[in-house]
C-alpha cells in the first residue's frame, strides 16, 4: 500500500517505510493514498487482538506476520484480556484505556509500535539503528519508554516540558531503566518540545547520521493505526451488552489535545464502523473547540496549565491528517500548515468546515467543571475518573443537552485517576497533603479502588534522568547521545 505526505502527492513510500520514517521529508504526515476495503462486521467477531491484527494488516500490509506481532505486543501486559474494557456508568459507557503497563491510553499504541518498527526494519533490510524522538505532555513519554526500552537496534529519547507534567508522570519517566533510553526536560511547554522534535527531523534531513530518525508520537502512522482497534472493541461491547443492534450508530466523546485519539475514531468510521458523532473534548486550552465551531485555528494565545496536562496543547498535529482526508488537497494542506507556522493561525474554506462539522462536535471543560464532574460521577455512580476523562464526560453531557441525540454514548477514559491524585482527591473531598504517593494511598483507602502496580512501585525508585535544557539545545542533546 502506498503512502504519501499530507502536503505533497509525490515521494510515495510503502507502509513499512512510512512507519520507519515517521514524518515525511516535507514535514507532512504520511497517509495512505486510498483507505482499504474492510470487512468491519467480520472484524467485530474476534478478540481485541484479532481486531488489532485485522485492522493493522489492512492499513500496514507491507509489514508481515501481523497476528504474531500483535500477540507479542499485548500478551500478559494488560490487566484484562480484552485490553480496553467498556463499563456502564450512569447514562454513558466508559471505555477504559488505562489498563496497560503505564496506566494510560498510549499503552495500546506504544506496546504495538516497537513490534511494527522492528518488523518494518527487517522487511526493508535496514541495518542502522533507529533513534526514536518523542515529545510528551505526560503519558506518551513513559508509554514509549516502556515499549522501547532494551529493544535491540533502537534507541529512544523523550523530551517533556519542565514543570508541565504531574509528579507521577515525571516519576514514571525519570526512573526509567534500560540501556537505550534518554529522558530530558525542556524549559518551555509541550508545543515547544513538539516543535523542537519536528525541527530536529528537518535539520537532519539529508544528513549522514549514525542512526535513522523516527517518532513515537502520533505523527507516526504506526502509532496512530493501533488506536483504531478500541473503537471496534467498544462497539462490540455495546452489542454484547444488548445496548445496540448491529448497524446502530454510536457516539464517542474523546478527550484530545493532539487530535490523534479522535482521528483514530474517524478512521474507524472510514473503515465501516457505524460511528455517529465524534465529540472533541478539550480543556481550557480550547483551540480545537474554537476551530471546529468557527473554522479558524489560532494558536496565538497563552498556554494554560490545567489539571489535565496531557491536553495542554495548542498545536494539534494530527488535525493535518483530517484536513487532508476531508479535502483531498495536499496543496491546500501545505498552505494552511505554512500559515500556522508563520502567522500562527489559518482559516479553512467554508466547504471544508461544513464537512468537519458534519462529522465532529466540540466542547471544552475548565478545571472547575472537571472537578465538579469527578466529584459528581463518584458520588452518583461510585466511579472514579481522572480530569481528562471528566473533560470527555462534560463534552458528552453538553452534546446531549444541546442536540437531544439519544444514540449510545461512549466516553473514552484515557488515564488512571491515580496519575492525578491531587485533582481526584480534591474533587471527592479528600485530604491532598503529602507527596503524590501518599495521596495515591489515601485515595485508595477512601475509595477501595486499588492503585495500579506500576504506579505503586514508583515510590523510592532511583531517578536516572534529571537533565533540563533550553529548547534550542534539543538537537545538540540528541547528537551527543
Q: PLM ranges: what are they?
A:
Residues 1-481:
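PLP-dependent amino-acid enzyme catalytic core
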Amino acid at each position: 500500500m502506498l503512502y504519501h505526505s499530507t502536503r505533497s502527492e509525490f515521494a510515495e513510500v510503502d507502509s513499512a517505510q512510512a512507519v520507519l520514517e515517521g514524518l515525511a521529508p516535507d514535514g507532512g504526515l504520511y497517509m495512505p493514498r486510498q483507505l482499504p476495503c474492510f470487512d468491519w462486521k467480520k472484524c467485530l467477531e474476534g478478540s481485541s487482538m484479532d481486531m488489532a491484527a485485522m485492522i493493522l494488516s489492512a492499513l500496514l500490509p507491507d509489514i508481515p506476520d501481523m497476528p504474531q506481532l500483535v500477540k507479542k505486543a499485548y500478551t500478559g501486559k494488560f490487566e484484562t484480556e480484552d485490553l480496553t474494557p467498556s463499563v456502564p456508568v450512569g447514562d454513558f459507557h466508559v471505555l477504559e484505556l488505562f489498563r496497560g503497563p503505564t496506566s494510560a491510553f498510549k499503552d495500546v499504541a506504544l506496546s504495538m509500535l516497537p513490534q511494527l518498527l522492528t518488523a518494518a526494519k527487517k522487511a526493508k533490510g535496514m541495518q542502522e539503528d533507529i533513534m526514536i524522538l518523542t515529545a510528551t505532555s505526560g503519558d506518551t513519554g513513559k508509554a514509549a519508554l516502556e515499549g522501547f526500552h532494551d529493544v535491540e537496534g533502537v534507541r529512544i529519547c523523550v523530551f517533556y516540558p519542565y514543570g508541565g507534567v504531574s509528579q507521577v508522570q515525571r516519576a514514571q519517566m525519570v526512573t526509567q531503566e534500560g540501556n537505550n533510553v534518554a529522558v530530558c526536560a525542556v524549559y518551555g511547554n509541550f508545543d515547544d518540545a513538539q516543535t523542537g522534535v519536528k525541527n530536529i527531523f528537518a535539520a537532519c534531513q539529508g544528513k549522514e547520521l549514525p542512526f535513522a530518525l523516527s517518532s513515537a508520537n502520533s505523527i507516526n502512522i504506526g502509532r496512530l493505526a493501533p488506536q483504531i482497534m478500541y473503537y471496534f472493541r467498544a462497539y462490540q461491547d455495546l452489542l454484547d451488552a444488548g445496548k445496540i443492534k448491529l448497524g446502530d450508530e454510536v457516539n464517542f466523546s474523546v478527550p484530545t489535545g493532539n487530535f490523534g485519539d479522535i482521528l483514530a475514531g474517524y478512521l474507524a468510521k472510514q473503515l465501516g464502523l457505524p460511528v455517529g458523532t465524534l465529540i472533541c473534548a478539550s480543556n481550557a486550552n480550547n483551540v480545537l473547540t474554537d476551530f471546529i465551531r468557527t473554522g479558524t485555528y489560532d494558536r496565538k494565545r497563552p498556554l494554560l496549565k490545567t489539571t489535565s496536562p496531557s491536553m495542554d496543547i495548542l498545536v494539534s498535529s494530527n488535525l493535518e491528517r483530517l484536513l487532508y482526508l476531508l479535502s483531498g488537497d495536499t496543496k491546500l494542506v501545505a498552505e494552511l500548515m505554512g500559515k500556522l507556522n508563520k502567522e500562527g493561525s489559518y482559516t479553512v474554506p467554508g466547504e471544508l468546515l461544513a464537512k468537519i462539522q458534519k462529522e465532529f462536535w466540540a466542547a471544552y471543560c475548565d478545571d472547575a467543571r472537571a472537578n465538579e464532574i469527578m466529584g459528581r460521577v463518584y458520588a452518583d455512580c461510585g466511579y472514579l475518573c481522572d480530569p481528562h476523562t471528566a473533560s470527555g464526560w462534560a463534552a458528552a453531557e453538553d452534546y446531549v443537552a444541546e442536540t437531544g441525540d439519544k444514540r449510545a454514548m461512549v466516553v473514552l477514559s484515557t488515564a488512571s485517576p491515580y496519575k492525578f491524585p491531587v485533582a481526584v482527591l480534591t474533587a471527592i473531598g479528600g485530604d491532598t497533603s503529602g507527596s503524590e504517593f501518599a495521596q495515591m494511598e489515601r485515595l485508595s483507602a477512601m475509595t477501595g479502588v486499588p492503585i495500579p502496580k506500576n504506579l505503586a512501585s514508583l515510590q523510592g525508585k532511583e531517578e536516572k534522568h534529571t537533565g533540563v535544557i533550553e529548547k534550542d539545545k534539543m538537537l545538540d542533546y540528541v547528537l551527543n547521545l
